[in-house]
Amino acid sequence: MEIGSFLELDLRDTGELFDGSEVCRLNLNRAGIYHCCRLLNVNKVLLPYYECFTVRDFLLGKGLKVDYYHIDKDFMPLDISQGDDTAIVFVNYFGLMSTEHMLSLIEGYKNVIIDNAQSLFAKPINGVYNVYSPRKFVGVPDGCYVVGPDAVRFSDEYDQDLSSETAGFLLQRIEAVSYTHLT
């Protein structure tokens, strides 16, 4: 049984967290970061060293170049050198960055992607791409929101992803809880 960042299946109709023409819905956070790179028309991405390896592997698998930058003990970027055709991913680790702090952090950079995988309720920053992963906060098997300028562009080019292949752990949690109450 998987627990980690997965919560119980939630079937309540609570509506969408993000809605509108500047919102694209995809299956995975790493797919959202790739989608942002397509929107930005870049062929290279700067990631912090402290980023999930699945993001790196996914981007490399899509033909993007990946480079890294260091962060300090407070998760702040150190010594970043960004080229013209390069996107930079800033991570809102554990939701610790306020909107004001993020605005000051991204100042002076171009092709900015904010990875809010750990910060579902962080307000999107206007003019850049914000990527969210709801499965770490609510009981859904997968999903990603990309919020930013013309975020839906290219979305019709992707195959429809179905969650039935990846949702088994949510049903196992329900069965496990039911079983423990019966015994």
Predicted regions, residues:
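Non-catalytic, alpha-helical, charged scaffold/linker segments
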Residues: 165, 173-178
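PLP-dependent aminotransferase-like
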Residues: 5-19, 23, 31-107, 116-120
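Conserved small/polar residues in nucleotide/adenosyl-binding loops
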Residues: 180-183
